[in-house]
Amino acid sequence: MKKTYLLNSEISEVVARLGHTDLLVIADSGLPIPDGVKRIDIALTKGIPSFKDTLNTVLTELGVEKAYIAKEMIDKNNDLYLYLLELFGEKLIIISHEDLKAMSKNARAIIRTGEYKPYANIILESGVEF
C-alpha cells in the first residue's frame, strides 16, 4: 500500500505522468468538463470531498509552477481566494472564468470534487522539482 497521502490511483497516475507545464484542473461540482479531457469524478455528495481537501492532497505529490483561478472568485468566494493567495503567492494568476474554461480544454485531466461553492476551480501548471 502507498505510504503517501494521495491514495486515489487515477489521480496518482495522472500526477506521475505530468510533465513540465502540463495542466491539471481541480474543479467544483459544476465546472463543465470538455469532451476529450480525462474526467476523474470523485464527487460523492454536496461538499464531499471538498475543493481544499482535494487540492491539499494533490499538492503533496505535485510541484506547481503556476496556478490559475477565475477573477470572479475574488468577489464570489473570497475566503477561498485569500486561502489560495496565501498558499501560492506570486504563482497565483488571475484570469476570467471564460478563459479558465477555455484553458481547461488543454488539461491532462479534470478532477471533479463535491465542492458546492462558486468558482472553486483551479488550473495547476506542473513545475519541475530541480
Curated annotation (Swiss-Prot):
Its main location: cytoplasm. Keywords: Carbohydrate metabolism, Cytoplasm, Isomerase. GO terms for molecular function: D-ribose pyranase activity; intramolecular lyase activity; monosaccharide binding. GO terms for biological process: D-ribose catabolic process. Substrate binds at residues 28, 97, 119-121. It holds the Pfam family RbsD_FucU. The keyword Cytoplasm applies. It is an enzyme of class 5 (isomerase). Belongs to the RbsD / FucU family. RbsD subfamily. This is D-ribose pyranase. The lineage of its organism: Bacteria, Bacillati, Bacillota, Clostridia, Thermoanaerobacterales. The gene is rbsD.
